[in-house]
UniProtKB/Swiss-Prot annotation:
SUPFAM superfamilies: Clavaminate synthase-like (SSF51197). It is an enzyme of class 1 (oxidoreductase). Its cofactor is Fe(2+). This is Lysine-specific demethylase 8.
Length: 406
């Protein structure tokens, strides 16, 4: 097997002139100088490793720029600088014959770029993390102590409260409707529906049935953002970055002391292409106005008991259930006033009402709002029309995939 550095060097540009460092005048000259020195050192005759200290200076300086003001106001140029800093740090870590812990640190650095930076050099950090993953000998700590366990096995936080559905309010189900029928019966009139049968051939159900150990194997060493707290409207709710292995150990198979953790609304499939190969974009998305590249695919992975408060999405949504079950309740946008949205701009798309335990003294009109409900099971795909309100509670360990499209 070739060394880590040999494989990494092979994906870098052959010459310094092919290594782009094009930035606008918004970037400080001192930062550009650091970037140029790091690049030039890489191509020196002595084949010296990139300075780890200089790479960290670039990362730290650009990190400060990323954390000033709101995220949407961050200039993309500084995100690119951050990614270059991460690239140079990875190159400094991997020069020579690094041990396993250093390779894992390099993977984390790549992930930080993928999460916080911007794509550079034809998404080179995504290619590097693929090389590094193949060099990690053990992606699952203590794997010898584990067996291949199905998701269906009862785990921490599995929910004891089973919903009793009202048959008159259940979301309708249909098996593989034609594009024309889906458009005429559900998309145009904005009616929720559960579509059955369209995930039958997904590799996530066939060649690579998703299990705890499978996720550890393909994504265990990857750093991801998780939400800590029962729901994002709680005061104690927070976010942090940990590896998928750590998330599973602490929040899926760990003790109750760790609280509730949720890998929610994260574009995991862009970060881990192996998982993206296990799913398929529903054909019905072609009825939208955008291209396939405009579809946002998010992962939702967590224990039973996780809750997404009653809220609206900014686009049409197909919610596909791969593992476990979820109770979902939907309300029409016509009932928005009766759902008491938060007044703050930050939470204007979220209701103040606890759906399954409403305070009808404080929110008296909530009981007048008409709703539909369902239990989404593995293989089901729920169409949630644009601006529909919906509430979600995981009944057990669950993995869902959402497709936002316009």
């Amino acid at each position: 097997m070739a060394s880590v550095w040999t494989d990494i060097r092979a994906v870098l540009p052959s010459t310094v002139s092919e290594f782009p460092l094009d930035f606008s005048e918004k970037i400080d000259l001192s930062v550009l100088k650091c970037l140029e020195l790091s690049r030039d050192q890489l191509y020196s005759e002595a084949d010296c490793p990139v300075s780890a200290e200089r790479a960290q200076i670039i990362i730290d300086y650009s990190w400060e720029k990323l954390n000033i003001g709101t995220w949407r106001d961050v200039d993309k140029e500084w995100r690119r600088v951050y990614s270059y800093g991460c690239l140079f740090k990875v190159l400094s870590l991997c020069h020579g014959n690094p041990p396993q812990n250093i390779i894992q640190e390099a993977v984390r650095t790549c992930d930080m770029s993928l999460l916080m930076g911007a794509a550079i050099m034809d998404n080179i950090l995504q290619r590097l993390v693929g090389i590094l993953r193949n060099k990690i000998k053990t992606t699952c700590p203590n794997k010898a102590e584990r067996s291949e366990e199905p998701f269906s096995k009862k785990r921490k936080h599995d929910c004891k409260s089973e919903p009793v559905l009202n048959p008159t309010k259940e979301v309708p189900r249909i098996h593989c409707p034609s594009l024309e029928r889906f458009r005429s019966d559900f998309l145009d009139p904005k009616k929720p529906v559960i579509i059955e049968g369209i995930t039958d051939l997904w590799p996530a159900f066939t060649q690579h049935p998703w299990s705890i150990d499978y996720l550890r194997t393909v994504a265990g060493c990857r750093t991801v953002p998780i939400e800590v707290g029962s729901k994002y409207t709680d005061e104690e709710w927070s976010q942090k970055l940990i590896t998928v292995n750590d998330f599973i150990d602490r929040y899926i198979t760990g003790t109750e002391e760790d609280g509730v953790g949720y890998l929610a609304q994260h574009q995991l499939f862009d970060q881990v292409p192996e998982l993206k190969e296990d799913i398929r974009i529903p054909d019905y998305c072609c009825l939208g106005e955008g291209d396939e590249d405009d579809i946002t695919i998010n992962a939702w992975f967590g224990p039973g008991g996780t809750v997404s408060p009653l809220h609206q999405d900014p686009q049409q949504n197909f919610l596909a259930q791969v593992v476990g079950r979820k109770y979902i309740r939907l309300y029409s946008p016509e009932d928005t006033k009766s759902l008491y949205p938060h007044e703050s701009q930050l939470l204007h798309n979220t209701s103040q009402v606890e759906v399954e335990n409403p305070d009808l003294v404080k929110f008296p009109d909530f009981s007048r709002a008409s709703y539909e409900e369902c239990v989404l099971c593995p293989g089901d795909v729920l169409f949630i029309p644009l601006q529909h309100w919906y509430y979600v509670r995981s009944l057990e360990l669950s993995f869902s995939v959402s497709f936002w499209w316009s």
